[in-house]
């Protein structure tokens, strides 16, 4: 008689079977946090800390602020995915999010959102200071309640006021270092506030059909390209002007000043190019996406310059 040995239930095979499943689940949870958004938010955090310190803060403070800020942004993103799961399935851009595909259940997403938010506040409170923790809580509240629940489905100005949540990282960073919120932090807050519309509206022009299908009144989806391009140009000019306030009111030096002028001029050129194209085309997709990607490059360059600035020469005014 021949003995048959089954290997389907051995611990090794069980481990192999569970491994990919665990990896998929972890990846799904990560996707809930909108990591690309977190990356963009963190671009502003460390440079602001360096500028506030006029040098490098302690490694412990940097880690606490970056991790706490990332967790706060991730919590807000996960709450957003939970609340918007009904419209995400209607949009090609978001139809593969974990709550739409079923990789994560609504209950799991909600618990994850709360845990991540609680961890963020605790890390900022004990790793930095209570002020930065309160600002982190304010950022989560603003994105989840003000933007996602109240504004997003009701007004074409949703991203203008709701986008203020994305400005909080500079306040958190400044508060973590100085335990206060001063004029340079407020100016940087306003730069990102004014940057948000010319960043997102070109994207909503490109994916206008998605937003219309989901009945989300994003300006780029419900207004014509001519109207949207005018708004993009106006906000771009206001943003560049605001960025230059760091020179008289924020103690900025030559590195920041030159970068703000040159990068600002380049982004204004791209914004005006979108406007010119919009006068001839109903949906200037390629030019709109060029402005979208250009806005990311602009903000990255500006904050890199902010980080380098304290190490290279005195302030332009009063130095």
UniProtKB/Swiss-Prot annotation:
Its main location: membrane. InterPro entries: Protohaem_IX_farnesylTrfase, UbiA_prenyltransferase, UbiA_prenylTrfase_CS, UbiA_sf. CDD domains: PT_UbiA_Cox10 (cd13957). The keyword Metal-binding does not apply. GO terms for biological process: heme O biosynthetic process. It catalyses: heme b + (2E,6E)-farnesyl diphosphate + H2O = Fe(II)-heme o + diphosphate. The chain crosses the membrane at residues 59-79, 108-128, 131-151, 158-178, 183-203, 232-252, 254-274, 299-319. Gene3D superfamilies: UbiA prenyltransferase. Keywords: Cell membrane, Heme biosynthesis, Membrane, Transferase, Transmembrane, Transmembrane helix. Its EC number is 2.5.1.141. Pathway: Porphyrin-containing compound metabolism; heme O biosynthesis; heme O from protoheme: step 1/1. Pfam families: UbiA. HAMAP family: CyoE_CtaB. Converts heme B (protoheme IX) to heme O by substitution of the vinyl group on carbon 2 of heme B porphyrin ring with a hydroxyethyl farnesyl side group. GO terms for molecular function: protoheme IX farnesyltransferase activity. GO terms for cellular component: plasma membrane. It is a multi-pass membrane protein. Belongs to the UbiA prenyltransferase family. Protoheme IX farnesyltransferase subfamily. Carbon 2 of the heme B porphyrin ring is defined according to the Fischer nomenclature. This is Protoheme IX farnesyltransferase. It is found in: Cell membrane.
